Amino acid sequence: MIHTDRLTRLFLALASIDNPSRQEAAVSTYIKNQLDELGIRWREDGTGELIHGNAGNLYGYLPGALDLPPILLSAHMDSVDPAVGKHPTLHPDGTITSDGTTVLGADDLSGVAAILEAVRSVEESGAAHRPIELLFDVAEEPYCAGIQHFDFPSLQSKEAYILDLTGPVGSAAYQAPSILA
């Protein structure tokens, strides 16, 4: 079961971290700490160096007890500018906004938070699940600069959910310039 209060706190924490493109190290460290808490093996690639950034793409793997192919969950760690000095504000009605001086960073830290909470909830439930691959990429905003350097053949998943889309809940994109084929 998803814990909405915990998800809100997680998003607020992530949205408080500076995360302009190619400067995602602090967000990456936060995610790595979350993955460590969950006992999820992770690795960071060398993309940061290739794109003159301070962090690489993060890959995580959570084994599953079900004999099913893994599924990939993905979101990017950067936000459009201005993404430095962010102050997310939780309003009494439950909405979250920026303070108006920067972006909120919901694109795509909301996706990062949703993935981390979903994985935590699955683990806490004790329910058998299929293996889960996680991919958190850097420098998505400047034309997917970071994900272009990821080692896609290393992925086992044939199905993926990339949590980076605006629109009504339940909307899905089936084609885009950077959709994994």
Feature annotation, model-predicted:
Residues 3, 147-181:
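Metal-dependent peptidase/peptidase-like ectodomains
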Residues 18, 22-25, 33-38:
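Short glycine- and acidic-rich boundary segments immediately preceding or forming the N-terminal edge
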Residues 28, 34, 53-54, 61-63, ...:
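Active-site metal-coordination/substrate-binding segment of hydrolases
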